[in-house]
């Protein structure tokens, strides 16, 4: 087998594995979120379907597959139909340039757990994950429903604003490391616990986490949905499998975001003491992923004006200040 054929086959297998694993993890995350929220609210959560309620995932999947798929008669039908697909595709494509685990040897071949190790991986991931919002905007606009349009418009304003915050935070990381490659950023933090970038860029870490909550539409910074104001927002008219595609795309983006935070700030998949790197990667990513649930349970929903004022009056000035300080530190 030629090197190109082996590379193509390896990339195809990796793509299939990533889609299968992360689609399954997205479903498992819904169960985890229910259990965590139930614990915070002194409830039991899912416990009737299967042991510890684990088969609830299968029940939900059957419901989504068998529920009637309704397309409103006054909607832009083609755009309405493909918007959920855009959400899921963009979320999974963004995973292609993210190194998941340390490299390992299989049948004499060195395998890198990454589909494409490109030298601008950080730009690729941020760009493709940002495209997920086109699905939200197009779905809300095509629904021809006032609640959907309001949710899409609110989300559009927020994502444009907070993408700037996240980008400015990441530029500081790139200035320190000198590379857009996520593998290089991971290797930069390989000298031990105190080489983690969270200690060198604590403000960038906080800014990026806040921007991540906006990009993944998570409480308390979610503007696209609000039961008391705009019902289900962009997803008001969606049902069945199409709604499920939005759901899978959102949770896949959350998982990708948690892995990205681990790679950028928490030492990535470097080993820690006697703990292997792959275990560290899973533990740290799971901890960041837990923050999504904790924030939803602990904090109230912010008003749109509060979210936007926080962005332009506090976060962007802080991001610019952090960038200037980092530039001075690099020059000196």
Curated annotation (Swiss-Prot):
Keywords: Cell inner membrane, Cell membrane, Membrane, NAD, Quinone, Translocase, Transmembrane, Transmembrane helix, Ubiquinone. One of its GO terms (biological process) is aerobic respiration. It catalyses: a quinone + NADH + 5 H(+)(in) = a quinol + NAD(+) + 4 H(+)(out). InterPro entries: NADH_UbQ_OxRdtase_su1/FPO, NADH_UbQ_OxRdtase_su1_CS. It is found in: Cell inner membrane. GO terms for cellular component: plasma membrane. It is a multi-pass membrane protein. GO terms for molecular function: NADH dehydrogenase activity; oxidoreductase activity, acting on NAD(P)H, quinone or similar compound as acceptor; quinone binding. Its EC number is 7.1.1.-. The chain crosses the membrane at residues 4-24, 44-64, 78-98, 120-140, 165-185, 194-214, 255-275, 279-299, 312-332. PANTHER family: NADH DEHYDROGENASE SUBUNIT 1, NADH-UBIQUINONE OXIDOREDUCTASE CHAIN 1. NDH-1 is composed of 14 different subunits. Subunits NuoA, H, J, K, L, M, N constitute the membrane sector of the complex. Belongs to the complex I subunit 1 family. NDH-1 shuttles electrons from NADH, via FMN and iron-sulfur (Fe-S) centers, to quinones in the respiratory chain. The immediate electron acceptor for the enzyme in this species is believed to be ubiquinone. Couples the redox reaction to proton translocation (for every two electrons transferred, four hydrogen ions are translocated across the cytoplasmic membrane), and thus conserves the redox energy in a proton gradient. This subunit may bind ubiquinone. This is NADH-quinone oxidoreductase subunit H.
């Amino acid at each position: 087998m030629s090197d190109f054929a082996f590379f193509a086959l390896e990339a195809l297998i990796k793509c299939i594995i990533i889609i299968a694993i992360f689609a399954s993890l997205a479903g498992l995350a819904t169960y985890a979120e229910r259990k965590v929220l139930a614990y915070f609210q002194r409830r039991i959560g899912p416990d009737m379907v299967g042991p510890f309620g684990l088969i609830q995932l299968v029940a939900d999947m059957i419901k989504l597959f068998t529920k009637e798929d309704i397309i409103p008669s006054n909607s832009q039908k083609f755009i309405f139909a493909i918007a959920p697909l855009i959400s899921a595709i963009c979320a999974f494509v963004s995973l292609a340039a993210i190194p998941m685990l340390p490299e390992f040897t299989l049948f004499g071949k060195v395998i890198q757990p990454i589909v494409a190790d490109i030298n601008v991986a950080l730009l690729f991931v941020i760009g493709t994950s940002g495209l997920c919002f086109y699905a939200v905007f197009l779905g809300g606009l095509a629904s021809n429903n006032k609640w959907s349009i309001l949710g899409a418009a609110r989300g559009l304003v927020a994502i444009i604003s907070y993408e700037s915050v996240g980008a400015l935070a990441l530029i500081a990381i790139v200035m320190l490391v000198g590379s857009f490659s996520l593998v290089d950023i991971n290797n930069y933090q390989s000298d031990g616990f105190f080489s983690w970038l969270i200690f060198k860029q604590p403000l960038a870490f906080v800014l990026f986490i806040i921007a991540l909550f906006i990009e993944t539409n998570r409480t308390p910074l979610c503007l696209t949905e609000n039961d008391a104001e705009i019902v289900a927002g962009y997803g008001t008219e969606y049902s069945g499998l199409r709604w499920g595609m939005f759901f899978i795309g959102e949770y896949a983006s959350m998982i990708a975001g948690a892995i990205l935070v681990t790679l950028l700030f928490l030492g990535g998949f470097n080993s820690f003491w006697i703990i292997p790197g792959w275990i560290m990667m899973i533990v740290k990513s799971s901890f960041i992923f837990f923050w999504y649930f904790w924030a939803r349970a602990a904090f109230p929903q912010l008003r749109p004006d509060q979210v936007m004022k926080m962005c332009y009056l506090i976060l962007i000035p802080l991001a610019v200040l952090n960038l200037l300080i980092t530039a001075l530190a690099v020059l000196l």
